[in-house]
C-alpha cells in the first residue's frame, strides 16, 4: 500500500484517508483514488457516480441519505474547507444515532469514506468550498431522506459561530429528528 494512510474512526466503517502527496517546485501530484490501494485498505466498493458542489461560507448541506437505495460515499474538498459529518443509521448498530465529524480541506487533502446507511452533511468553514464525492449508487430523487442538522438527540457540535448565520435549502430546514426517523422505520 503506502500511497494512502487510513485512519479508523470511533464508529465502525467510517474511515479517514490521507493520500501520499509528491511535491516539488512545480507543484504536487497525488492519486485521489486507486482501486487496488483502497481495496487493500478494506474499501472494496465500485463507484458509479461522481458529484461536485460549490458553496459559500456557512452553507450547511444535510443531513442526507437515500432510504431504499443506500450508497457508500468517498468525499473530499478540492477548494476551501468544510466540517463533514456522518450519523450512523445502520439498524442494530451499537453506535446507532452517533455522529463523527472531520475537517476536510484542499490543504489537508483528507478524504472521508462513509458506508451505506449513514446520514451525511457538511458545513462550509472557508469563504468558498468545492466538494467532490464518489457514490456506489445513482441519485434517486424519489428516495431522499434526511435528518434535522441540529437534532438534540444526535447532538452534532457544528463549528459555527451562530446557527442564525447558516445558509440552508428549504428542504434541509424541514427534516425531522432521529426519533421520528427511527419510529417511521419500525412501523
PLM feature segments, named:
Residues 1-107, 126-128, 135-187:
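Non-catalytic, conserved peripheral segments adjacent to functional cores
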Residues 112, 120-125, 133:
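Short beta-strand His + acidic residue motifs that chelate non-heme Fe in jelly-roll/DSBH
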Amino acid at each position: 500500500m503506502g500511497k494512502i494512510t487510513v485512519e479508523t474512526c470511533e464508529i465502525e466503517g467510517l474511515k479517514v484517508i490521507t493520500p501520499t502527496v509528491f511535491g516539488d517546485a512545480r507543484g504536487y501530484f497525488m492519486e485521489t483514488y486507486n482501486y487496488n490501494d483502497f481495496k487493500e485498505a478494506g474499501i472494496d466498493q465500485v463507484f458509479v457516480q461522481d458529484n461536485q458542489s460549490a458553496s459559500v461560507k456557512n452553507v450547511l448541506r444535510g443531513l442526507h441519505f437515500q432510504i431504499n437505495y443506500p450508497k457508500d460515499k468517498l468525499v473530499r474538498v478540492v477548494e476551501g474547507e468544510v466540517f463533514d459529518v456522518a450519523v450512523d443509521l445502520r439498524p442494530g448498530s451499537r453506535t446507532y444515532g452517533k455522529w463523527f465529524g472531520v475537517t476536510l480541506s484542499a490543504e489537508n487533502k483528507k478524504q472521508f469514506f462513509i458506508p451505506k446507511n449513514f446520514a451525511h452533511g457538511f458545513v462550509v468553514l472557508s469563504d468558498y468550498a468545492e466538494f467532490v464525492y464518489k457514490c456506489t449508487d445513482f441519485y434517486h430523487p424519489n428516495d431522499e431522506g434526511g435528518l434535522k442538522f441540529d437534532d438534540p438527540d444526535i447532538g452534532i457540535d457544528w463549528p459555527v459561530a451562530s446557527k442564525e448565520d447558516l445558509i440552508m435549502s428549504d428542504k434541509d430546514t424541514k427534516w425531522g429528528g432521529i426519533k421520528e426517523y427511527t419510529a417511521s422505520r419500525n412501523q
